[in-house]
């Protein structure tokens, strides 16, 4: 299960019910803007028209249903230019500023973030091409690391249900590999290989072809990227992974 699954489950858990109408998920990217998030002028048949953005509309929806909690999930939050996307909302998302209205950039309207709106941001710390979160935004969030779940009771039961010797050897090797990654000064725990590579399998779908594919086309290429300047380390660990599925 990946971080998206966890974020939605967290929202439903806090709600106490699975209500998809009170959860919205978007994904930030380099082209995502304040105009997409809050509001901005967009081309129309007659020129330009002021369009409301995803977060603006979500907040308005939550505002008229103040007795219920609403969850706005942002995937890949560190892929966007956060200062430009959030704009004046940097202040409005703080706990003690909720409900306080502020005039928006493109409108005379006063806008406030309702107290019943919760923001869940997800980020991949292993992507070297991405900047870390702006400190001004960072202090407005609580942080929680999602670690590989190989040792969880659920994954152990999953392994037992699959009952595949080669799969078990591969997982044990990946756990050893993760210990190596976590103590590597150029990598660290944020680069550990997650359990999502190995999920959603059934006893009749896990075979030598699948095992070969995940090792050769997913795990080994990842190691080549991690240790691009240490080919011998890549070679050694590649051989270790391959040996588990022979």
Explain the meaning of each model-derived region.
Residues 1-187, 202-217, 221, 225-246:
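AAA+ P-loop NTPase catalytic core and its hallmark functional loops
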Residues 197-199:
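Helical subdomain adjoining the active site within ATP-dependent kinase catalytic cores
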């Amino acid at each position: 299960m990946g971080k998206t699954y966890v974020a939605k489950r967290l929202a439903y858990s806090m709600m106490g019910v699975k209500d998809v109408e009170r959860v919205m998920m978007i994904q930030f990217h380099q082209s995502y803007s304040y105009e997409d998030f809050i509001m901005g002028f967009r081309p129309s048949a007659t020129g330009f028209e002021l369009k409301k953005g995803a977060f603006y509309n979500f907040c308005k929806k939550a505002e008229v249903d103040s007795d219920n909690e609403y969850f706005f999930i942002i995937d890949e939050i560190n892929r966007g230019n956060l200062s430009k996307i959030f704009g004046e909302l940097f202040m409005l998302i703080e706990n003690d500023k909720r409900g306080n209205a502020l005039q928006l950039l493109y409108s005379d309207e006063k806008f406030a973030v309702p107290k019943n709106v919760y923001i869940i941001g997800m980020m991949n710390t292993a992507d070297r091409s991405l900047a870390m979160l702006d400190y001004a935004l960072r202090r407005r969030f609580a942080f929680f690391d999602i670690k590989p779940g190989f040792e969880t009771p659920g994954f152990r039961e999953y392994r037992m249900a699959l009952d595949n010797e080669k799969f078990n050897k591969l997982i044990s090797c990946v756990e050893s590999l993760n210990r190596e990654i976590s103590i590597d000064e150029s990598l660290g725990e944020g680069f550990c290989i997650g359990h999502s590579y190995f999920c959603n399998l059934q006893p009749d779908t896990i075979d030598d072809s699948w095992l070969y594919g995940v090792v050769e086309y997913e795990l080994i290429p990842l190691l080549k990227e991690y240790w691009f300047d240490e080919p011998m380390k890549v070679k050694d660990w590649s051989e270790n992974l391959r040996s588990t599925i022979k």
